Amino acid sequence: MEELTPRRIVEELDKYIVGQKNAKKAVAIALRNRYRRKKLPEDFKDEVMPKNILMIGPTGVGKTEIARRLARLVKAPFVKVEATKFTEVGYVGRDVEGMVRDLVETSIRMVKQEKMAMVEDRAQKMAEEKIIELLAPYPVQQTAARNPLELLFGAARQAEQTDKNQEQRIKRIDFEREMLREKLARGELENEYLEIEVEDSKPPMLEIFTASGGMEEMGVNLQDMLGGLFPKKKHKRRVTVREARKILTQQEAQKLIDMDEVTAAAIKRAEEDGIIFLDEIDKIAGREGYGPDVSRGGVQRDILPIVEGSTVMTKYGPVKTDHILFIAAGAFHISKPSDLIPELQGRFPIRVELESLTCEDFQQILTEPRNALIKQYTELLATEGVKVKFTENSLVEIAKIAYTVNEQTENIGARRLHTILEKLLEDISFEAPELTGKEIVIDREIVLEKLGELAKNKDLSRYIL
């Protein structure tokens, strides 16, 4: 984290998101402040609260992507929730505490994967030993005596003979296992089939009442509650050695990690580094106390204690929300940030306005980011042996059309490019298997031929683009 200076964070975000310098700067500072807080003395650390961010801007300009890439950059637990999914207590809908529970689940998954990666080599060796056991099992010890008379006559001689046979068999199997071990190391058995026992991954679920009175599926499973009284259900599967190695490595890795340690580390990570992205905050900005939107103000009041810092009960234990970073976002076309209740406004001190995308922005989005759309489409078609090239003037035209359609109809930001490229490459994608080995050049004329009329006709572009 030390090398992630605000400037470096912005540079990393620039690899995936075009423009929006102010928003990138705000999140970079918020992230760096977390690192600074961790270096403070213990007695002062708890006094420093994160400065939550409110992003204001139309859809498709990069609000969610900025938050998501930021979380990936620092390996922080991240959840995106829509504020419209929540309702105040007493109405049908999700309880606002659900977002904290989701964050803890994400954190548990992250820490568990990290711990499993640390023991992967050991787990793989154990899995390979299991595969060898399944391919060359030791014989089952059989009782020498078959009827009561044998217990009196000749039982000792027979037992001696049986033991010798057993020893020879075991030696033969040991030799066979060594051969299998060598073949397994050389990858010669990858496509051989064998039968393995697989544990059921889905435990029985219970719905329980939460502290706020709502019904929330917390994933409490009977096994945790009854302390392993019931053994885990298993079923047999016939798989290749390659698949068996993956399944058994996973099972062995889970046995090697300490889940109590995972839970403690995950809760700490969620509390200290967690990021909750509250989308569509503008949709609950009204303060009406009647009609279909009666619970809007109630949702804001319910969100308030979580944002300002409270303790939420989860199935893994209590989680403090004091130092979780909240990033709220909304288009605010109809409502204004000032329509939020004053207490909630005060909890989002950093306001960032994201600009609508220009024609130049669209051009950059097509080619510059690491996951640029043009790269995505050309790589997809390359898997069929079709080489697609876009000329510079074709990219300019695509950007112009995207900008024009956004201006004439609803502004959906960069998502408009997906619609336009799908329409443009529709025939090529359909015929790709028959075009193997060919090179297709897409220039301005082809773009205008496919999309020109649609873009000019307002009614058509409203439905098709």
Curated annotation (Swiss-Prot):
Keyword check for ATP-binding: yes
Disulfide links within the chain: none
GO MF, any single term: ATP binding
Any one Gene Ontology BP term: protein unfolding
Record: residues binding ATP: 18, 60-65, 279, 343, 415
InterPro entries: AAA+_ATPase (IPR003593), ATP-dep_Clp_protease_ClpX (IPR050052), ATPase_AAA_core (IPR003959), Clp_ATPase_C (IPR019489), HslU (IPR004491), P-loop_NTPase (IPR027417)
One GO CC annotation: HslUV protease complex
NCBIfam families: hslU, PRK05201.1
Subunit composition and interactions: A double ring-shaped homohexamer of HslV is capped on each side by a ring-shaped HslU homohexamer. The assembly of the HslU/HslV complex is dependent on binding of ATP.
Function per UniProt: ATPase subunit of a proteasome-like degradation complex; this subunit has chaperone activity. The binding of ATP and its subsequent hydrolysis by HslU are essential for unfolding of protein substrates subsequently hydrolyzed by HslV. HslU recognizes the N-terminal part of its protein substrates and unfolds these before they are guided to HslV for hydrolysis.
HAMAP family for the chain: HslU
Protein's recorded name: ATP-dependent protease ATPase subunit HslU
Organism name: Pelotomaculum thermopropionicum (strain DSM 13744 / JCM 10971 / SI)
Encoding gene, per UniProt annotation: hslU
